[in-house]
Curated annotation (Swiss-Prot):
Gene Ontology terms for molecular function: SNAP receptor activity; syntaxin binding
Subcellular location: Cytoplasm; Golgi apparatus membrane; Cytoplasmic vesicle, Autophagosome membrane; Cell projection, Cilium membrane
Keyword vocabulary terms for this entry: Autophagy, Cell membrane, Cell projection, Cilium, Cilium biogenesis/degradation, Coiled coil, Cytoplasm, Cytoplasmic vesicle, Golgi apparatus, Ichthyosis, Membrane, Neuropathy, Palmoplantar keratoderma, Phosphoprotein, Protein transport, Transport
GO biological process: autophagosome maturation; autophagosome membrane docking; cilium assembly; exocytosis; membrane fusion; protein transport; synaptic vesicle fusion to presynaptic active zone membrane; synaptic vesicle priming
Name of the encoding gene: SNAP29
Source species of the chain: Homo sapiens
SMART domains the record matches: t_SNARE
Name used for this protein in its record: Synaptosomal-associated protein 29
Oligomer and partners: Forms a SNARE complex, composed of VAMP8, SNAP29 and STX17, involved in fusion of autophagosome with lysosome. Interacts with multiple syntaxins including STX6. Interacts with EIPR1. Interacts with STX17; this interaction is increased in the absence of TMEM39A.
Length: 258
């Protein structure tokens, strides 16, 4: 004789403690005994499997939406890093220009110190105009790794928006995009058309999640490289600013001594 009541839900066994009593069937008819009991039990199991498949498909769709949202945030942060790189490079160029101008000023001051040599040196050694650096004429670009990651994510985002308008929910009228399960044999899916559609949707979402996580990884690695390169720029800029500050103070002292 069975140790369980005649009506219990085997799906609830996994979530129960060993000492807990089996949960009763959550069915209006409570699966009464009779000649139709096996058929009723089988029908309930089909409905339960279908319900859980639907919930899983909806869960993977939500996860996919969150993944794409995270990717958008990553792209926006990467683009902000690229703009910051441009600011740093322009600042470094301005500091270099200030240093060149200061050197010219120091030459003039040294020339003025000598009454006779001043005029001769002034006209003899005119300030040499330094040609603008080629980097200053180009638009600042992030490192290639980050640039490719941003481009790939933007292309995929456009495809996602086209194929997932308003994060459309899976239902009986729109079970799954055609061809979503083409990569697998149809024998691998259940014969029930609705259940098959849910399984195909789940597989499609998981495939997209896998590729999306790969793109997120590329963005993260690209941002890491970009931050390291910008740290190098900051180190150079700090050194140049400190040197410029010393030269400015030295020039001020020379001017006061005139």
């Amino acid at each position: 004789m069975s140790a369980y009541p005649k009506s219990y839900n085997p799906f609830d066994d996994d979530g129960e403690d060993e000492g807990a009593r089996p949960a009763p069937w959550r069915d209006a008819r409570d699966l009464p005994d009779g000649p139709d009991a096996p058929a009723d039990r089988q029908q309930y199991l089909r409905q339960e499997v279908l319900r859980r498949a639907e919930a899983t498909a909806a869960s993977t769709s939500r996860s996919l939406a969150l993944m794409y949202e995270s990717e958008k945030v990553g792209v926006a942060s990467s683009e902000e890093l690229a703009r910051q790189r441009g600011v740093l490079e322009r600042t470094e160029k301005m500091v270099d220009k200030m240093d060149q101008d200061l050197k010219i000023s120091q030459k003039h001051i040294n020339s003025i110190k000598s009454v006779f040599g001043g005029l001769v040196n002034y006209f003899k050694s005119k300030p040499v105009e330094t040609p603008p650096e080629q980097n200053g004429t180009l638009t600042s670009q992030p490192n290639n790794r980050l640039k490719e990651a941003i481009s790939t994510s933007k292309e995929q985002e456009a495809k996602y928006q086209a194929s997932h308008p308003n994060l459309r929910k899976l239902d009986d009228t729109d079970p799954v995009p055609r061809g979503a399960g083409s990569a697998m044999s149809t024998d691998a899916y259940p014969k029930n058309p609705h259940l098959r559609a849910y399984h195909q949707k789940i597989d499609s979402n998981l495939d997209e999640l896998s590729m999306g996580l790969g793109r997120l990884k590329d963005i993260a690695l690209g941002m890491q490289t970009e931050i390291e390169e910008q740290d190098d720029i900051l180190d150079r800029l700090t050194t140049k600013v400190d040197k410029l500050d010393v030269n400015i103070k030295s020039t001020e002292r020379k001017v006061r001594q005139l």
